[in-house]
Amino acid sequence: QRNELLSDKQITNRKRFGRLLFTNIFIHINQRENIDDLSFELFEKEYKVLKNYLPNNISNILDIGCGLGIINIFLQQHYNTNLKFFLIDKNRVDLKIKYGFNENYESYNDLRETKKLLSNNDIKKENIFIIDADKQINIDYTIELVISLKSMGYHYPYEKYLPLLKKVTSKDCTFIFDLASERYKDFEILKKHFKELKVIYEEESIHPLKRVICSGLIKNI
């Protein structure tokens, strides 16, 4: 899911054969031998960006577009309490990967693997709630932290989940998510929904992003 984890030979194969053939045939060829270590190193860097902005004393985390959910392992270590994790993503592998921003984003996930990975890394199984984004979403807990890294607002409109967020989040909930810089050139639309927002990180790439922290979700519009 992350291009940063591709080896040089994989990048060459993707350019040579195209994204569709690469994704379905060649993606496991010439893979980095230490891919697991690199994945954790990548999300450790993500955690270091977030850690100074994380709220205190929370019980429930919602991760939208969780993928393998690795960031939640670092969040569990950060809080070191009996947190509950609600993980939303599509639960299928589509034939064609779409890069960048798309109204109908694609999926490359097996949520069973997500739950297995987290439970193997000191998160209790009973605290992992896997939610298929294509099905009805029911969350009976109050969420105090919402994260969405390179998903909501980056690959598809963040407004997609606003009705859910207004329903399940606390009044003091913290939201951390990525915005596609080319799509959201200013923050006027965000200011209609959040009382406070701040850019905490920017990434320049083919698909640049701004990571924002928001609070004060306005629920009556």
Identify the residue ranges that each predicted region occupies:
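A short acidic, Gly/Pro-enriched loop at the edge of an enzyme's catalytic core
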Residues: K135-V146
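Conserved class I S-adenosyl-L-methionine
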Residues: I58-G67
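A short glycine-rich, Lys/Arg-flanked "PGG" loop and its adjoining helix->strand segment in the class I
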Residues: E159-K171
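Class I SAM-dependent methyltransferase Rossmann-like catalytic core
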Residues: R2-L54
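Conserved SAM-binding loop of SAM-dependent methyltransferases across substrates and taxa
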Residues: L68-T81
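Conserved beta-strand signature within the Rossmann-like core of class I S-adenosyl-L-methionine
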Residues: D172-A180
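S-adenosyl-L-methionine
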Residues: N102-Q136
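A short SAM/SAH-binding and catalytic strip from SAM-dependent methyltransferases
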Residues: E144-P157
